[in-house]
Every structure is written in structure tokens, then in C-alpha cells.
């Protein structure tokens, strides 16, 4: 197995209640990208209006001191990925995002840049979903049909962004998020699922993974009871799961 050079910042949500776009994690983004990165390649495929989405992301990253290029503005998306200093994939609909990644032949290109070349990768919400083994545990509606649910596989487990605890006062009779993840684990040979509540994110550096942010994460392992974990918890053992 090749040595992983991955540097990932996998964020549950782009906007935290009461704050601005990426405001809750901007200090971590600055530390993550550092001074060596000058420009970030943004992948806006998860939303329909890519121009407006790129404008929002560009304003934020320029305020942080980085230039931003959007892959949809490039005549050759694969070449744009090959030249990227850092990659940021934003949130939206995960099915739409993954289909566009396949349609533009970016799966292998992104994997090579991140896992072999060590290019920093930031994912938010849907961008975090596609960084995992598959999008089986996304919360989104399948509004389009990608050729596969298999994703970038930058980590060997799945993540459920925006993880939501059951509301004991609600009269809603639909399944809880925990019940849906449990259903997923009723299927044979399904990987761990890390439920990231809004306000937390996972930092992956090589073979080390650490929970950051202000909220806890809930870990689901097939055949076991879910467990709660505070910010600062070491999730490196998940990187050895296959």
C-alpha cells in the first residue's frame, strides 16, 4: 500500500447558525492552507448556479488572503486539477456533485493530486461526503443519477455531515438519522460512518485523523452501539479500516 500524503479538512457544514460562510472554521482553514498556498481551486458542482457559488467562495477566500479559481470556468477541468495548489469542494446536492465529478473525469485526477501529490483538500458538507468511500450515507435526495455511488475514497470510511440528534419533543414519525445509518449497517460489509454534527470537522494528516470544532461526533460501527466523541478525539484508527 502506498504511503498516504493526504491533507484533508472535512467540514460538516459551510455555515453555522448565526455566522457567515465558513466563518466557524476560517481560522482552521488559514492554518490548514498556510502561507505556501496562494490559490485554491474551487469545485462548485453541488449547486446549480455555479457562477454565484464561485462568487461567494471567491469573496471568502480572498478575504482570507487566497486567490480562488473555479473549475467550471476552466476549459479543461482535469488540467485545472493537475495544476491546483489546493482543492475546495463546497456543499449542495451530493448526487449532483458526484455526477459532475464523473462527467468531467475528475475522480482519478483528484485522487492522484490528494493522495499521491499531497495537495490540500477541503470539503464542506457534500464536499465532505464525496471525500469518503461512497455517498451511501448522504442526507440528500437523488435528484440526478451518477454512474456510481462510489466516491473519491480519500478516507476508508463514510461520513454523515449535518448529523442530527432526534428531537424528543417532535411529533415527526419519520426515521431518525441514527435509524437510517443503522439500516445502512444492516447491509453486509459496510464501513464505519462518522456522524459530524454542525460545528465540527475532521482534520486528516497522512495517517492521523483528529476531530476539531465545537461539537461532538457520533461514530457508528457495524454491529456495535454508537459512541460519542469530543473535539480533540483521535480517529486515526478509522484510517486503517478497510
UniProtKB/Swiss-Prot annotation:
A cellular component annotation (GO) from this entry: cytoplasm
Listed InterPro entries: Class_I_gatase-like, Peptidase_S51
Q: What is its EC number?
A: 3.4.13.21
Q: What class of enzyme is it?
A: hydrolase
A biological process (GO) of this protein is:
proteolysis
Q: Which reaction does it catalyse?
A: Dipeptidase E catalyzes the hydrolysis of dipeptides Asp-|-Xaa. It does not act on peptides with N-terminal Glu, Asn or Gln, nor does it cleave isoaspartyl peptides
> Which Pfam families does the entry link to?
Peptidase_S51
Q: Which residues form the active site?
A: 125 (charge relay system), 140 (charge relay system), 162 (charge relay system)
Organism domain of life: Eukaryota
Q: Name one GO molecular function term.
A: serine-type peptidase activity
What keywords does the record list, in alphabetical order? Cytoplasm, Dipeptidase, Hydrolase, Protease, Serine protease
- Classification via Gene3D superfamilies: 3.40.50.880
Cellular compartment(s) = Cytoplasm
User: What is this protein's function per UniProt?
Assistant: Hydrolyzes dipeptides containing N-terminal aspartate residues.
Tell me the protein family, please: Belongs to the peptidase S51 family.
Record NCBIfam families: PRK05282.1
The name of this protein is Alpha-aspartyl dipeptidase
User: Which organism is the protein's source?
Assistant: Xenopus laevis (African clawed frog)
Amino acid at each position: 500500500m502506498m504511503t498516504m500524503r493526504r491533507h484533508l479538512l472535512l467540514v460538516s457544514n459551510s455555515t453555522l447558525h448565526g455566522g457567515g460562510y465558513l466563518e466557524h472554521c476560517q481560522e482552521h482553514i488559514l492554518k490548514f492552507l498556510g502561507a505556501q498556498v496562494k490559490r485554491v481551486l474551487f469545485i462548485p458542482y453541488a449547486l446549480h448556479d455555479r457562477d454565484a457559488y464561485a462568487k461567494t467562495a471567491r469573496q471568502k477566500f480572498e478575504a482570507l488572503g487566497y486567490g480562488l479559481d473555479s473549475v467550471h470556468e476552466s476549459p479543461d477541468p482535469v488540467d485545472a486539477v493537475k495544476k491546483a495548489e489546493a482543492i475546495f469542494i463546497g456543499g449542495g446536492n451530493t448526487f449532483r456533485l458526484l455526477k459532475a465529478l464523473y462527467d468531467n473525469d475528475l475522480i482519478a485526477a483528484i485522487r492522484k493530486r490528494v493522495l499521491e501529490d499531497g495537495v490540500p483538500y477541503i470539503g464542506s458538507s457534500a464536499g465532505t461526503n464525496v471525500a469518503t468511500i461512497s455517498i451511501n450515507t448522504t442526507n440528500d435526495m437523488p435528484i440526478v443519477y451518477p454512474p456510481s455511488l462510489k466516491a473519491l475514497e480519500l478516507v476508508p470510511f463514510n461520513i454523515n455531515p449535518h448529523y442530527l440528534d432526534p428531537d424528543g419533543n417532535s411529533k415527526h414519525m419519520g426515521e431518525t438519522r441514527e435509524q437510517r445509518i443503522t439500516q445502512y449497517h444492516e447491509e453486509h460489509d459496510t464501513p464505519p460512518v462518522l456522524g459530524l454534527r454542525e460545528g465540527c470537522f475532521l482534520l486528516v494528516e497522512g495517517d492521523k485523523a483528529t476531530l476539531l470544532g465545537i461539537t461532538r461526533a457520533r461514530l457508528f460501527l457495524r454491529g456495535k452501539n454508537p459512541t460519542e466523541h469530543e473535539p480533540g478525539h483521535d480517529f486515526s484508527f478509522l484510517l486503517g479500516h478497510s
